[in-house]
């Protein structure tokens, strides 16, 4: 018997400082409605909430805080960092997401900033492979559990929708039957039962 959970996988939101905020609100409203209808067990945002990394506006913070609060009102929401959420050359500096999650102080909104394992219920474990903490990437400590890697970057051995190969990045050694590689990540065409590690790409 397989442990089944419903995961809503989001990535690359790219909230800009001032542009497109009316469009974001409209899309976020439709997203909240769809998520409320689908009732996921967990929502995962795999990187790039921000667009401009370090030069951020009050409007960005307001939009991002409202977005995460809206997701947290629907289901447990797990957030990881992407390359647009901070400067990879100065990883000792604060990122664009941590202050928002800390200010929200919502137990339903969790930021996985560092690499490591995040156990859910029913033997399911998210393994965060943070691009800001590559020295601490680890293989699953219990291969008997369902291990799902959270990673913002290219997946080694895959191709873009234009046919270009990804040459480095997360190693996902699970055959992903019923999926196809698309520009924004992995599209699931049918329910997927995972026996080996799976990488959710941002």
Regions found by a protein language model. Name each.
Residues 1-67, 73:
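N-terminal active-site segment of His-dependent metallophosphoesterases
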Residues 55-201:
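His/Asp/Glu-rich metal-coordinating catalytic cores
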